[in-house]
Amino acid sequence: MTEKLKVPSTSRLVLEAAMQLYTTPLQQQYIEAIDFSETSGFYDELKQQYPFIADMICLRKQSIRRMLRERMPAFPGQQVIMLGAGLDPLSLYLLENYPQQISRIIEVDNGYIEEKQQLYEEIMPGNPLIRFIKCDITDTALLWSKLLENGYREEIPAIIVFEGVLHYISNDAFVQVMQLFKTPQQHHLVLLDYSLSEEEVPARFLSYHKAVKEVLENYIGRPVNVNNRADIAGLLYQLDGILDTVEPLCETEKKLTGDNHLFHAPGEGIVEMVSFRI
């Protein structure tokens, strides 16, 4: 293995929060190739302002994996398109668990995707199922051409993973990206999370919500995109999408753990999970 990869603060936060999920051999090899030694003021501040931040991220990732697992039997040979894939080793999880059900995985990101590709190549040389695209996903013309170059086919059912992305782009940009994936049969499934607007957050969690939003906005230098449930319904209406699920994090926790230790009501947890067909 080459020198370990140093990761940006946001990626470190996400990877460390979900470490308990990375238990399979390929995922463990991948995590061992990443350098987590550097301290991060951003990471520490987020944990200080919101003690449940790691739990929230872990539940979000577990929810995405659960929705993938539930979808896999629906169609043979599905495509998986990861937009804003980041450094999460979700592709390794899929290749270890569902190699016969997947025809292609395409990861798209505008940062660290080449380094990630190199790590994957060292772990599983020459794997034919996975492709990597370095691209700003909001550049829809370039994104579309790159998807076609890398084997995306509209007629093959696909799972579009849009995890941890809508917080950082506008709703208009989201709609433009999703327009690329509309199909007459509506056989693509989109999985995403979104940040809740304040009116959706119970009073006891509002201080956490405001604090996390402020830390994130100071770090990225622009507002975080927040939405209420009506906003999400409006986006789906623009896309002629068919809603599958809207899942508050309290429901996610209940499904995954059998209880509610952290989040007890809708609106707690900062984000909610959504899946829809397009």
Say what each PLM segment does.
Residues 222-246:
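Short alpha-helix
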Residues 142-143, 168-181:
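A short, conserved alpha-helix within the catalytic core of class I
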Residues 256-278:
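Core SAM-dependent methyltransferase catalytic element
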Residues 185-198:
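Conserved beta-strand signature within the Rossmann-like core of class I S-adenosyl-L-methionine
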Residues 142-154:
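Short amphipathic alpha-helix with an adjacent loop that forms part of the alpha/beta core around
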Residues 152, 156-172:
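A short SAM/SAH-binding and catalytic strip from SAM-dependent methyltransferases
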Residues 205-221:
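Short, glycine-/aromatic-enriched active-site segment of Class I SAM-dependent methyltransferases
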